[in-house]
Amino acid sequence: MAKNKHNLESGSSIERSDERIKETQEVFTPPDLVDSMVNDIPEDVLKDPSSTFIDPSAGSGNFLVGLKTKLMEYHDEHHIVNNMLYAVEIMPDNHKELCVRLGVRSNHHHYVCADALEYDYSFGDPIGVEQYFN
């Protein structure tokens, strides 16, 4: 069972074989690409405490961890993880690692283990777009 090279670069502790990668089609965003993407977000968006960000295929959290790090330049950690970041991840082991890396409980309603193509995206609270899906 060979460990996937990309997994070694992602900082994940989950053992991912080449067979698993082939079966699940998991692709992880390398840290340098995460940094580039996060640095492309306009500063006024990062500074706005009402900004929200979702990763609908979060994996083990590379993008959200990088984004959280950047947001901590402007906001406290509690506000970021409870008001600004959201994630959906289908693989239970990835979801668990995502939550550990973000420092939240695995049952936190912003970070769900579900199929992003079927999830209702309410995250437990009405968000005002439900009227468009009836």
Description of each model-found segment:
Residues M1-N134:
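SAM-dependent methyltransferase catalytic region
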